[in-house]
């Protein structure tokens, strides 16, 4: 088994488990088993944002881990190419299922574009990256939204022409946690948290590690499985 940083797998596993939980709540609402505004309540909205933050933070940290010393182009295009293709497929499938509420620029789209931007930032030190993240966060706070703008700019920032979407993560502000992840690399390395291991965990954390290592696959298949499960339940009852 290749060496990995186990705590990152654990955090990613917790994040994907949280995402499945959130989507299960969405399905309960969608199929009429919960009140129609369930996931729009403040606590659920916060939960959703925490999940997105964690995925983007880990993605930024992983970019620095893999490419800080030198850019491994083969690894980069394999990882981010697959992510981008999956993002496009999700847009197509959600358009077929939900039409105008399709996912146009969701979490995978944000990770893909942030990865490209991140390549340009790899040589910045941690302090510079941190200040850039803070600047972008403040920019998002002080820019009045939605901005007057057309449909094309929805990938960058929320505009007056941005339609409804089941998952929407525009670059401003959602590149911020990605850059914070990049900025944290040197700090975590200083604290000795970047040590790799090929040790297999044989306790309750092993499931979380497995979920973390297979997070993209789980992300892609969990919602279809949940949907089919709900449809079968409705048919049987």
Identify the residue ranges that each predicted region occupies:
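Alpha-helical transmembrane segments and their immediate juxtamembrane cytosolic regions
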Residues: 1-237
């Amino acid at each position: 088994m290749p060496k990995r940083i186990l705590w990152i797998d654990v955090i990613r596993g917790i994040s994907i488990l949280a995402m499945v939980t959130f989507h299960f709540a969405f399905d309960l609402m969608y199929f009429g088993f919960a009140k129609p505004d369930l996931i729009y309540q403040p606590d659920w909205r916060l939960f959703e944002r925490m999940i997105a933050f964690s995925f983007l933070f880990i993605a930024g940290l992983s970019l620095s881990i893999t490419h800080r010393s030198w850019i491994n182009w083969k690894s980069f295009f394999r990882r981010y190419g697959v992510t981008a293709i999956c993002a496009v497929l999700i847009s197509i499938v959600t358009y077929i299922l939900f039409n105008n509420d399709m996912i146009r620029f969701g979490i995978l789209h944000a990770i893909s574009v942030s990865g490209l931007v991140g390549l340009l930032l790899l040589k910045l030190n941690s302090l510079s990256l941190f200040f850039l993240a803070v600047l972008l966060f403040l920019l998002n706070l002080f820019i009045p939204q939605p901005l007057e703008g057309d449909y094309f700019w929805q990938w960058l920032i929320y505009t007056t022409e941005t339609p409804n979407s089941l998952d929407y993560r525009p670059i401003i502000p959602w590149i911020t946690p990605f850059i914070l992840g990049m900025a944290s690399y040197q700090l975590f390395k200083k604290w000795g948290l970047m040590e790799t291991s090929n040790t297999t965990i044989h306790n309750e954390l092993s499931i979380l590690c497995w979920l973390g290592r297979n997070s993209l696959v789980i992300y892609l298949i969990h919602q279809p499985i949940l949907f089919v499960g709900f449809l079968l339940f409705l048919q049987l009852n």
